[in-house]
Curated annotation (Swiss-Prot):
One example GO MF annotation: RNA endonuclease activity
Protein's recorded name: Endoribonuclease MazF
Keywords noted in UniProt: Endonuclease, Hydrolase, Nuclease, RNA-binding, Toxin-antitoxin system
Major enzyme class: hydrolase
Subunit structure: Forms a complex with MazE which is no longer active as an endoribonuclease.
Length: 120
C-alpha cells in the first residue's frame, strides 16, 4: 500500500514550463485515507540538481540515509496530483522527523498558517 512519506520513482512527463519532469523520485504527501481509496496520489518532486535547500519550501534528504544516488532536495513548491499508474517503484520512506520538515515546508508553500490577509 502507498503511504504518506513513501518515496517512489514516478513518470512526471509530459510537463510544461518550469515543472519538474521525466522519471524521478517523488515523495507521497497525500494522507493515507486518500492513498488507500483514490486512484490518484498527491506528490512533491525530488531533484538531485541541487543538494542544498535554497528556499523555505525545500527539504534536504541525504543519499546515504535514504538510499538515493545523490543528496537531493524535496521541492514542496512543486506538488502535483498523479494517477497511481505513474508510480514505478518504491525506493524508500522518509523518517518521522523528515516528514515534520516536509509538513513545515508545505505550510509555507500553501500558506496554511497565514490567514492575516483574509481579515477585514
Amino acid at each position: 500500500m502507498i503511504r504518506r512519506g513513501d518515496v517512489y520513482l514516478a513518470d512526471l512527463s509530459p510537463v510544461q514550463g518550469s515543472e519538474q519532469g521525466g522519471v524521478r523520485p517523488v515523495v507521497i504527501i497525500q494522507n493515507d485515507t486518500g492513498n488507500k481509496y483514490s486512484p490518484t496520489v498527491i506528490v512533491a518532486a525530488i531533484t538531485d540538481g541541487i543538494n542544498k535547500a535554497k528556499i523555505p519550501t525545500h527539504v534536504e534528504i541525504e543519499k546515504k540515509k535514504y538510499k538515493l544516488d545523490k543528496d537531493s532536495v524535496i521541492l514542496l513548491e512543486q506538488i502535483r496530483t498523479l494517477d497511481k499508474k505513474r508510480l514505478k517503484e518504491k525506493l524508500t520512506f522518509l523518517s518521522e522527523s523528515k516528514m515534520i520538515e516536509v509538513d513545515n515546508a508545505l505550510d509555507i508553500s500553501l500558506g496554511l498558517n497565514n490567514f492575516d490577509h483574509h481579515k477585514s
